[in-house]
Design a protein with these regions (language model features):
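Bacterial N-terminal signal peptides
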Residues: 10-19
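Cross-family detector of peptidyl-prolyl cis-trans isomerase
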Residues: 2-5, 22-240
């Protein structure tokens, strides 16, 4: 069920904080008219945010929203006891969940198709090799010293891109390398970095099965995304 009631309570709480700051600075008590308008405007802003966020799924009628607000304020309706309203809110929630699921599935399909095409093209480049589970890589500098093990801690600089070239993360841009245990990251990294040594540089094209799979990662990496990385191994610390 949508948390409409919590939205209203949150608005009142924020209003209290805002009013409190006014009292502290000006020591002026707002009139009932001003206070009422302020609370209404605050709640209206929050409702507008909700309406705007859901407009691709549901076309709300502002006039009917005002009707519902008016009836609730006048005590003509109690959302907690009105079965029709509860059923309507549950229906809204189901519609939003269904739309979100469909959107994720659409994103995943597009990402998979784009990734499949990208990997096929990358595999044709000079010097590119593939592991048995589909990791594509190109070693631009092998590095020196002992081989890297999955249990080692490595310090690296990297840039990660989607097939369309969009950078989703880069320690290089931040100017700060990262350090981690190699067996605690995505499988493509665990496997790929063991192909070079300290000082090595490698390009990795990681299929979704060896990256973030159907879950994706936040807003920057969609489900079923193929990932491209340029990685430089700055240091290696074997497990003690």
């Amino acid at each position: 069920m949508l948390k409409i009631q919590k939205l209203s309570l949150a608005a009142l709480m924020v209003s209290a904080v805002v009013s409190g700051s006014v009292f502290a600075e000006d020591k002026a008590v707002p009139s009932a008219s001003d206070a009422s308008y302020a609370v209404g405007a605050l709640m209206g802003n929050q409702v507008k945010d909700l309406v705007d966020a859901q407009k691709e799924v549901i076309q709300y009628d502002n006039a009917r929203i005002l009707d519902g607000l008016k009836d609730a304020l006048e005590g003509k309706v109690d959302v907690r006891k009105d079965e029709k309203i509860q059923k309507t809110l549950d229906g809204i929630q189901e519609q939003l969940v269904s739309a979100a699921k469909a959107k994720v599935e659409q994103q995943a399909k597009a990402a998979k198709e784009e990734g499949d095409k990208y990997r096929a093209e990358f595999a044709k480049k000079d010097g590119v090799k593939s592991t048995k589970d589909g990791l594509l890589y190109k070693i631009t500098e092998a590095g020196k010293g002992d081989g890297i093990k999955a249990t080692d801690t490595v310090k690296v600089h990297y840039t990660g891109k989607l097939p369309d070239g969009k950078v989703f993360d880069s320690s290089v841009e931040r100017g700060q390398p990262v350090e981690f245990k190699l067996n605690q990251v995505i499988k493509g990294w665990t496997e790929g970095l063991q192909l070079v040594k300290k000082g090595g540089k490698i390009e990795l094209v990681i299929p979704p099965e060896l990256a973030y799979g159907k879950q994706g990662a936040g807003d920057s990496i969609p489900p079923d995304a193929t990932l491209y990385f340029e990685v430089e191994v700055l240091d290696v610390n074997p497990k003690k």
